[in-house]
Design a protein with these regions (language model features):
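C-terminal boundary and immediately downstream tail of ABC-type ATPase nucleotide-binding domains
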Residues: 130-131, 135, 141-160
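ABC family nucleotide-binding domain
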Residues: 1-140
């Protein structure tokens, strides 16, 4: 699960942040975990940042370290909760590219977002909620192309 706040340990490097849970929680061998952590940093386009501390990284880079950290646990599902909310447009794009790559590789994902254009592109199914209540759901083409509910239409007119 990833949130808008990165929740990285500030006193640990990017590599150490990624390695911690597989070693401490899963009991995996350090050498194996370290090799995987290096691979994951390359996967999220942060190769060469292994020794960087969170405070030395941009918001988008920190979010991608958080994604790599989650992937280190080999999840079958990723939950992204407003992961681009606090990011500027350039770093937002970096994170969205990473999420798109994971989806294209077959990672099952649940994405809570206000990035409607992105959701329309990558989602198999979209749920539109208002104050925690599902207002409407369906395939992206139907929901974005011909929303049935007035609340959905009004929102989409404002953001698209």
């Amino acid at each position: 699960m990833l949130f808008r706040s990165y929740n990285l340990f500030p006193h640990k490097t990017a590599l150490e942040n990624i390695m911690m849970a597989p070693i401490d929680v899963l009991g995996q061998p350090r050498a194996e975990v370290e090799a995987r952590a290096h691979e994951l940093l390359k996967k999220v386009r942060l190769g060469g940042k292994e020794s960087s501390y969170p405070g030395e990284l941009s918001g988008g880079q920190q979010q991608r370290v958080a994604i790599a950290r989650a992937l280190a646990m080999r999840p079958s599902l990723m939950l992204f909760d407003e992961v681009t909310a606090a990011l500027d447009p350039e770093t937002r794009k970096e994170v969205l590219v990473t999420i798109r790559q994971l989806v294209e590789e077959g990672m099952t994902s649940i994405l809570v977002t206000h990035e409607m254009a992105f959701a329309r592109e990558i989602a198999d199914h979209v749920y539109f909620t208002d104050h925690g209540v599902i207002v409407e759901d369906g395939p992206p083409a139907a929901l974005f192309g011909a929303p049935q509910k007035e609340r959905t239409r009004a929102f989409l007119e404002q953001v698209l």
